[in-house]
Amino acid sequence: MITIKKMAELLGTSTTTVSNVIHGKEGEVSPVMVEKVKKLIEEYDYVPNRNARNLASNRSGIIGLAMKASENKYDNFVKDPFAGELIGAVERYVRAKGYFTMLYVSSDIGEIISSVSSWNVDGLILLGMQKEDGELLNQKMKKPMVFVDAYFEDVSFDYVNVGIDDRKGGREITEYLIQSGHQKIAFLADNCMGVDYQRFMGYRDALTSAGLPWNEENFIRLRPSGADMSLILSQAYDRARDFTAFICASDYYAAFILNDLKDRGMKIPEELSIVGFDDNVCSRLVRPALTTVHQDVTEKSRITVEKLFHIINDEDYGANFEQLPVFIVERSSVRKM
């Protein structure tokens, strides 16, 4: 492969001039010479040495994407289409910036910090973090960071987060069920923190506004056990006759529960209406198709990457908190009573 030195010799110019064109510093080179260098690059199919460029700029060219997932939630967190869609979109937008994405998933924040620190990343995107995780990251990591879907209350540090209006989504899907004639509505989630807590609070807001009673038994805490979904499905089945509608905190759980209840002989939505949250592929694959809350994961990923690179480049990144809108997608899983 041709070198910068050889190109400079062929063009009768300096290696600095050729290097400036290759690295986009064309303002320091005459237009005629810029065209000559570009023509030579194309002729010899020259590919810049990324390692040398990163060394010169004191950057690694790596963006870390770290996800914290409960060890008993999934045997593989990426199986959830929400996670897969976000990872794919982040990687695509990071790659468009000329960077690489390194992914790390763990239930241990200490392990995440230790591993990510060894990568010498230029910036970090963080998902699934709770308040104490954010505080530890702020103490230990001195890299540009953008959180996704974080809700840190009463913290002493500034942080940047991109999310959606989870509480509004929980409220609107509950109002939709109430307007459809439902009053006995359960909320199902595997935790009551972060985004699931916000969605749950939206559910409670809607019940309160409608004058409907609520008690703790209406919150069905799903208890996953890795790859084994049988416990969750049994939990849902045992409570299904107590309600006319289930609100699941994610399409992932809603799809599993819907299919299992049908397999056990329940008619959906005639005997039980089921709705989800996310509007991912799960909502469209099951029958009846899920009514759900839509969020634009691709746009969330794009904004996250843009903010991170603005921070890396010491540019204005806008507001610390970016909240994307949500809306109801009506399909076939809700009975009008």
Label every PLM stretch briefly.
Residues 230-337:
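Flexible loop/turn connectors
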Residues 160-187, 197, 226-234, 293-313:
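Hydrophobic alpha-helical segments within soluble ligand-binding/sensing domains
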Residues 171-212, 320-333:
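An alpha-beta-alpha
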Residues 1-60:
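N-terminal helix-turn-helix DNA-binding module of bacterial transcription factors
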Residues 46-113:
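Amphipathic helical "hinge" segments at domain boundaries
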Residues 184, 214-218, 268-274:
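Short acidic capping loops at alpha-helix termini that bridge into adjacent secondary structure
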Residues 127-169, 252, 278-290:
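Flexible loop/hinge segments that line or gate small-molecule binding clefts
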Residues 91-105, 204-227:
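Short beta-strand elements in bilobed, periplasmic/extracellular small-molecule ligand-binding domains
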